[in-house]
Amino acid sequence: MTGEKIRSLHKDQKPSKDEDLLEPDEEATAGGTFTRTGKLKSSKMFSNHKVIRSPSNPALLQNHHHQQISPITPGESKSDVYFPVHECVLKGDIRRLSSLIRSHSIGQKDSHGNTPLHLAVMLGNKECAHLLLAHNAPVKVKNAQGWSPLAEAISYGDRQMITALLRKLKQQSRESVEEKRPRLLKALKELGDFYLELHWDFQSWVPLLSRILPSDACKIYKQGINIRLDTTLIDFTDMKCQRGDLSFIFNGDAAPSESFVVLDNEQKVYQRIHHEESEMETEEEVDILMSSDIYSATLSTKSITFTRAQTGWLFREDKTERVGNFLADFYLVNGLILESRKRREHLTEEDILRNKAIMESLSKGGNLMEQNFEPVRRQSLTPPPPNTITWEEYISAENGKAPHLGRELVCKENKKTFKATIAMSQDFPLGIESLLNVLEVIAPFKHFNKLREFVQMKLPPGFPVKLDIPVFPTITATVTFQEFRYGEFEDAIFTIPDDYKEDPSRFPDL
C-alpha cells in the first residue's frame, strides 16, 4: 500500500493554466514503497477507485454549497475579501467555526491558496480539523505552494490526523466515482463501437533508468458501455516495472462493485477491484507516508506555445508525416516547465539514509526482501513550537510569501524545462472528447491518467496521434495511436472466461 496511490484519481474538469498535470509521488517516495513483509509495493494500478483526485469540483461532494474553492481573482485586493472561516481556524475559535460552517464555504481558498482545512492541519488544531472533515472539507486541494492538507499533516506528524485525512480522502474518492458513473455511461453509450491500438515508449534522462524502461502495445476494445484493455505492462513506477499478459475489463451493466475486473491471462485467474481497505492496510499506509519524502510536481502550462516543426536542410517546410494510418502535422511544444518540490522536515537522518538505500537498491535491480527493508510503526512526532503569527500578519502578507505555519520547512525545489513534440491529425475518426471519456474509464492505470490530463490542454487542431508526455519527474513517454477501426466484437471478450478462477490476492496492490 503506498502513499503514491492517493494521487492518481483523474480530474472531472479541464485543467486551468497552472493545473497540476503531473503529480507523481506527492505524498510518498518516488519509486514505490515497501510493506511490513518486506515485499516491494509499487503505487496502486487502480488507485483512482480509491481516492479522489480533485475534490475542488463542488458537484462531486455531498455538501455542494460548502465546497466552492474561490481564491482572490486578479485585480482584487485582499482588503476587499474577508475570510471569516479561515480567521476563526487560525484563532482556534471552534465555537464560531461551528456556527460559520452552516452558511460559509469551507472549501474556499484564501489569498495564499490555503483552505480552512490547510490552516487547521498546519496549526495542529485537531478540533477545527475534525469539524471541517465532518462537513466534508476537500482533502485533495492544493495551496499556492502545491501542498494538500494531507501533505501538511505528514509534515506536522500527528498520526491520528494523518489517518483521519487519509480515510476522508478515500471516502471522497468513492463519492466521486459514484457521481461520475451516470455521465460516463451515457457518453460511452453514444460512442460507436471500435478497436484502438496505441504504443507506449518510455524514456529517461537518468542513465540507470533508461536501461530498464519498458515499452507497451495496448489494445482497447469498446462495445456499448463495455471496455476491454489488453496490456503487457502490469505495473510501472519510475524505479520498477512488471510485465505480463493482463486484461482490464469494465462492464458498465454490472453493479459498481462488480464493474472492474483484471484478468491474468498467463495464470488464468481474475481479481475484482475492491473499494474498501482493511484497518491494517490503512495503518501500514500511514507508516509509509510518515517515513517518506513529501513530494509535489507541477507541470506549469502558463506560457505554453505550439509552433510547427520544420523539415529539410536547404528549403525548410512544415513537417507533415504519416503516423500509423493517419497523416499528421507535427508541432513543437514550448514553455512547459516541470516544477518539483520535496520536503523532509518530518524525517530523521536515519529515515533519509534508509530511503536512499532503498532507491539505490531498486535502481540496481535489488530485492528488498533480501535486505529486510521493513516499515516501522511510526509514532506521532513532537509538535512544532506553538504558532505566534496573528491573523492580521498572515492575511496581509504578500502573495507567495505567507508566514510559515507548522514545522520549519526543509524543502528542495527544482525546475526543468520539458521539451515535447506532438503530431495532430485531421483524419483520425475519434474526437478528443470521446478519447477523454474512454481514458476516464481506464485512468486507474497511472500512465493512462497522465495521457488523459495532457490532452485536456488546448491543443492545435486535430487529434493527437503521437505525443510526448511526462509520466514521472525523470521519465517521459511517447504515445502513438497506431490503429483505429469501427466494428463489432464477440460479447465473450468482455466477460470472464469459464476456465479462469478468482484469486483475490493475485494483485496485492489492487
From Swiss-Prot:
ANK repeats lie at residues 80-111, 112-141, 145-174. The keyword Zinc-finger does not apply. Residues 1-19 have a biased composition (Basic and acidic residues). It comes from the Eukaryota. Gene3D superfamilies: Ankyrin repeat-containing domain. Pfam families: Ank_2, ANKRD13_C. GO terms for biological process: protein retention in ER lumen. GO terms for molecular function: signaling receptor binding. InterPro entries: ANKRD13, ANKRD13_C, Ankyrin_rpt, Ankyrin_rpt-contain_sf. Residues 1-35 are annotated as: Disordered. Keywords: ANK repeat, Chaperone, Endoplasmic reticulum, Membrane, Repeat. It is found in: Endoplasmic reticulum membrane. One of its GO terms (cellular component) is endoplasmic reticulum membrane. Signal peptide: none annotated. PANTHER family: ANKYRIN REPEAT DOMAIN-CONTAINING PROTEIN 13, ANKYRIN REPEAT DOMAIN-CONTAINING PROTEIN 13C. Acts as a molecular chaperone for G protein-coupled receptors, regulating their biogenesis and exit from the ER. This is Ankyrin repeat domain-containing protein 13C-A. It comes from Xenopus laevis (African clawed frog). The lineage of its organism: Eukaryota, Metazoa, Chordata, Craniata, Vertebrata.
